Amino acid sequence: MLLESNTKNEEIKDNLKYLVLLSKQYPTINEAATEIINLQAILNLPKGTEHFLSDVHGEYEQFIHVLKNASGVIKRKIDDIFGNRLMQSEKKSLATLIYYPEQKLDIILKQEKNIDDWYKITLYRLIEVCRNVSSKYTRSKVRKALPKEFSYIIEELLHEQPKGVDKQEYYDEIIKTIISIDRAKEFITAISKLIQRLVVDRLHIIGDIFDRGPRADIIMDKLEEYHAVDIQWGNHDILWMGAASGSSVCMANVIRISARYANLSTIEDGYGINLLPLATFAMDFYGNDKCKNFEPKIESDKSYTVKEIELIGKMHKAIAIIQFKLEGEAIKRHPEFKMEHRMLLNKINFEDSTIELDGKKYKLNDTSFPTIDKNDPYKLIDEEREVVEKLRSSFVNSEKLNRHVRFLFSHGNLYLKFNSNLLYHGCIPLNEDGTFKEVLIGSHKYKGKALLDKLDVLARKSFFYEENSKNSKYENDMIWYLWSGPFSPLFGKEKMTTFERYFIDDKKTHYEKKDPYYHYRDDEDICINILREFGLDSEQAHIINGHVPVESKNGENPIKANGKLIVIDGGFSKAYQSKTGIAGYTLIYNSFGLQLVSHELFETTEKAIKEETDIISSTVIFEKSVRRKRVGDTDIGKDLKKQLYELNLLLLAYKKGLIKEFVKS
């Protein structure tokens, strides 16, 4: 006991300066003791629910729906709460109301004959759901989440249990007054959004917000207003981040991909970027070229005129050629990238329209190259350079794009360690024997965690450096390397065969060899080694990975390496759904364990509201906690325990007279 007392005295002395500062915040024994009790209570609350999504690819309608229904969590809560008390049709209506309160209320107000009765029944049900989803949080945390205009009323309704006669009358009178003063519609909207907020404590987006889908900017708007979110950048995200940072080669890739999928709305409508300079240039130089290989891939639910398709095709080819030229320049600037094999324009034989790759000749299926000088194939002609500068200026000066990219930097990283899980989009580059691949950056080699840390720093410098500085140009090229470099943790392939897919019919040339990581991600020992590299040694640690769609219809399992690695690809991109057989996976991590959720196809928001159709989701509880996880078991819990330790030292210092209490007279 004496030894323990001496140890505590030493700890107080070692931390005395800090404890004096802490005493300003908790100036009395009572205040320090109260905070200790509060923190100890919080540690014993159930851990909050984490929601993991990946590979959204600009599909904003499906993304917003999955966000609103929390991958089926709200529907399951309604089932648990009401059981047999409500019919299935009533449960569906209640769920739809919680997801889309404003839109659903507009429909109900036109249909419902006795709206006051409907309001009364619905308000009681919503309060019951809200009480359930708020039960795992402190009153203080719930209070911070409450909408200001109804904060007092909601707090009263959540914490008043209408059991006694007086309490029941008080409770009923609040509901009655909300309806009588014509505030029921606004109240229902507010409490529905509160339920959406409370049902998920933290959202993780494991990359690729951007890509071929219609409006990635709408998704970014939604994430900006979300209460707690982090992002692990994907390869498509980094491309847009590079474009906003002033990288012409990243920008050319962004425009080419958008044109390929006839998705120019994110660029033009979302970010206000004028593509007229490219359209004019394309008509001038490719006006008589049918550009058959560059016809956009159009989804069945979109309609374009023949002229629109032709124009997009010409823009597509024009920017593709510009891209190949800019990439050639970047490769020449950086021999350390080891990407000389991707310089293909100089390998074209313009006499017989062939190209030699790996010692074999291939016939080109398109020989119209009006802007390529065969003696200097990577040189931009004046008109191309002018188009690039105009477009680059538009990307760099788009206020909304800059705001979104700043958000990606402030809320994102290449990887994240969170609650014993390692989150990243692509891969950790490996050698053929499963060891970490060393990658040369500048004059130093990096591997494993150090590689991702270095690339993360370079990506940030690219955006935040002064424009036109030498450094910013180097970092801009590094962002492009992250998009398509052979050892990029975001790309994860030996090469990107864009040129071959456009100009060579032989599909053997289209093959893109994957990083050895994708062979080893089924190997438990390799996955454990990756986790240890990032400082995660716990038996409960997992890798949560996106990027590559899981081919469920061919029997592929998203749970790999004996549960150490989980692949989630939200399946939001319709182009992959025929390949995967489902609309993808999301992950829920709550106090009871990990739940993998597979989703069927989502149709439209309009149908979800009018016909009350929800995404059909199947849940697999693949890892159940032996005991319910508490806040004390989380990363936040570690911080709280540190605070508790410091407060206990402060309390002891007060009691020993080493620090004086400050009691107001």
From Swiss-Prot:
Instruction: List the InterPro entries hit by this protein, alphabetically.
Output: FBPtase_class3, Metallo-depent_PP-like
Which E.C. number(s) belong to this protein? 3.1.3.11
What cofactor requirement does the entry state? Mn(2+)
Among its keywords, does the record have Manganese?
yes
What is a single Pfam family found in this protein's UniProt entry? FBPase_2
Coiled coil region boundaries: none
| Name used for this protein in its record | Fructose-1,6-bisphosphatase class 3
- Organism equals Clostridium acetobutylicum (strain ATCC 824 / DSM 792 / JCM 1419 / IAM 19013 / LMG 5710 / NBRC 13948 / NRRL B-527 / VKM B-1787 / 2291 / W)
Q: What is the lineage of its organism?
A: Bacteria, Bacillati, Bacillota, Clostridia, Eubacteriales
Q: Which gene encodes it?
A: fbp
